[in-house]
UniProtKB/Swiss-Prot annotation:
NCBIfam families: PRK00455.1-3 (NF001729), pyrE (TIGR00336). Its EC number is 2.4.2.10. It comes from Rhizobium etli (strain ATCC 51251 / DSM 11541 / JCM 21823 / NBRC 15573 / CFN 42). Pfam families: Pribosyltran (PF00156). This is Orotate phosphoribosyltransferase.
Amino acid sequence: MIQTTFPDRALMAELVAKMLWEIKAVHFNAAQPYKLSSGMASPVYIDCRKLLSYPRIRSTVMDFAASTLLRDAGFEQFDCIAGGETAGIPFAALLADRLGLPMIYVRKQPKGHGRNAQIEGNMPEGSRVLVIEDLTTAGGSMFKFIDAVRAAGGIVDHGIALFFYDIFGQQRFTDGKVRLHHIATWRNVLAVARAQQLFDDKTLAEVEAFLDAPLAWSGRNGGVSELSL
């Protein structure tokens, strides 16, 4: 199935943010910050994998992903969709079905030997591959999958994250010659929280302070204040 309707970008971002709140996939807690795997302290947390459990929301989000790619990348720019183990795999399958394309998945670690040791599925040499993840912060995990696809002979010029933290910019993607596509960010989630008055003003102000200066906020709240991006 090929998606051929193209909703406004701002509307898609707002709707995805509302969906994430509706299914309780996002959380704000400035008083007891979350500890991220990077060592950062954060007043925000998200679990995009919950999208998979809600068919109507899941279908709409994948329609938005297809629309974003067809409009911003083109209709004939990809030969294959790749999902990273594990969260990216179901979304890769859903997007590949939407776009009528083959799908592969990329292991975190090689299985066996050879240049295709991280690739599961059929990827001919020179295939133009789109890598999808449920979310990305600065691109570190996505580039592990991108590098594996490139090492196996694939061409990766584009990646898509359904949710982009958008707190560290896109320098990693610029340096890696990959265009990042995304649907929603923390700014969209915060805007919905404000509009619907989901939290008190102090909590919302703390979240905004984190988004404006994440490492400084982390350092003040028991987390690391420096990261290697």
